[in-house]
Amino acid sequence: MSILEVNGVKKVYSTRFGGARVEALKNVNFTVEAGEYVAIMGESGSGKTTLLNILAALDKPTAGTVMLEGNDLTAIRDKEVAAFRRDHLGFVFQEFNLLDTFTLEDNILLPAVLARLSYQEMQQRLKPLAQELGIADLLKKYPYEVSGGQKQRAAAARALIMKPRLILADEPTGALDSKATDELLGLFGRINAKGQTILMVTHSVKAASHAGRVLFIKDGEVFHQIYRGSSTNEQLYQKISDTLTMLATGGEQA
């Protein structure tokens, strides 16, 4: 069953004072099945960030539709967008986006507070989640008291606390060292194995090699995709590297 359907998405920006028009996305089409783990890759300027902003309901396409479980994101009224985003989507960012004056626990629970869940319900969700992510002993600490990897795990817990249908991850390993990267990718693998759908935008071949499918964006369109199939992470890593080389040299996919 498709959880996300992107159909004919186009995004055109006009420069200031009515100057030249920039076509960031031309004609993007793809679907994501429930329980899939999909990575999106492409060179800088290919349209990845624009696409992610549209999928996150932070921006609207010039043309086309984005359907999340039958809901057309492009048709949601502005005053309803924040609540829809909170109830259906979870976000993991490169820079963590934690509030320094909040403990990790308060950061994680913020979406639940905004959704007005009861204290009991929040704690019932928080405790097993913190245990799974290995941050149960850090909940009373502040972001500046923990490592980058621990911050990112707290950010992942915040993304999961509302049991979202889809996790959107934007360069989630970009600010992490090698050890923390391995830990986060392991975490993503575990939550995906439990049925969580993940869509990750990344420059990292290593991060993408943990996904089940990799989409490549070029010049505002989905240029190519690779399915994991029976490939190991190492084999998928090589396939991704070869495709990125082809993209960089202007080759065409047969």
Report each predicted region and the residues it spans.
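Helix-to-loop junction immediately C-terminal to a conserved catalytic motif
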Residues: 56
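Conserved ABC transporter NBD signature motif
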Residues: 64-72
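Conserved ABC ATPase "signature" region
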Residues: 71-72, 109, 113, 120-137
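ABC ATPase C-loop
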Residues: 135, 139, 159-160
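Conserved signature/switch motifs of ABC ATPase nucleotide-binding domains
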Residues: 141-144, 161-162, 194
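Conserved ABC ATPase signature
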Residues: 142-146, 150-152
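Catalytic Walker B motif of ABC-type/P-loop ATPase nucleotide-binding domains
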Residues: 167-170
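Conserved beta-strand-loop-alpha-helix hinge in the C-terminal portion
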Residues: 221-245
